[in-house]
């Protein structure tokens, strides 16, 4: 029986220059790759997705960026998502991408089907973006994703990162290692 590494699609709910969530995601990706995972990183902002509008979809179909997102999701076994919190919710960029990806696609299986996911957040606030993660967890679960129970929210993110990209707080660094480790062990590819 052949085995392969788990394939993980990683993306952030922010495309802001200097995004703390992009930094957190990059560090998590390093940890995953060091443990043997194949990780694809996708910049949601680069997909240039229009705001989802059913009439536009009916008239013109899904834009090319939506197809790229769906293909990337289908090519991977698991998702690693880092999202800031906007008004106690995850970002509009992330919500719009999920809305587009979840639309029916010419008889293709849902790109969310059978996926595992791990969630991360970082914020300059004291709560680290944790208030946005429950809504993201519910949405992904409703789409058939098994969202792992462990998660990480990094508070005071403007002070949280060392020069090498790691987290200065050893407890947060340990939790991040546990979250990515759980994602690797949750999916056992054949």
Question: Would you name each region that the model predicts?
Answer:
Residues 2-5, 9, 146-190:
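Glycine-rich phosphate/pyrophosphate-binding loop and the adjoining helix
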Residues 7-14, 118-121, 165:
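Short beta-strand segments enriched in small/hydrophobic residues
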Residues 8, 21, 25, 66, ...:
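A general structural signal for well-ordered alpha-helical segments in protein cores
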Residues 44-61, 160-164:
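N-terminal beta-loop-helix "entrance" segment that forms/cooperates
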């Amino acid at each position: 029986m052949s085995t392969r590494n788990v394939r993980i699609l990683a993306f952030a709910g922010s495309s802001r220059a200097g995004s703390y969530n992009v930094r957190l995601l990059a560090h998590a990706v390093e940890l995953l790759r060091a443990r043997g995972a194949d990780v694809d990183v996708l910049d949601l902002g680069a997909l240039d997705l229009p705001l989802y509008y059913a009439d536009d979809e009916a008239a013109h179909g899904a834009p090319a960026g939506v197809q790229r997102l769906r293909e990337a999701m289908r090519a991977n076994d698991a998702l690693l998502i880092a999202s800031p919190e906007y008004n106690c919710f995850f970002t509009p960029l992330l919500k719009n991408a999920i809305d587009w990806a979840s639309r029916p696609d010419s008889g293709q299986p849902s790109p969310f089907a059978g996926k595992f996911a791990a969630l991360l957040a970082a914020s300059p606030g004291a709560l680290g973006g944790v208030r946005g993660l429950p809504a993201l967890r519910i949405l992904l679960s409703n789409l058939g994703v098994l969202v792992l129970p462990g998660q990480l929210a990094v508070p005071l993110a403007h002070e949280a990162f060392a020069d090498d990209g790691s987290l200065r707080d050893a407890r947060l660094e340990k939790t991040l290692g546990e979250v990515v480790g759980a994602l690797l062990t949750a999916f056992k590819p054949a």
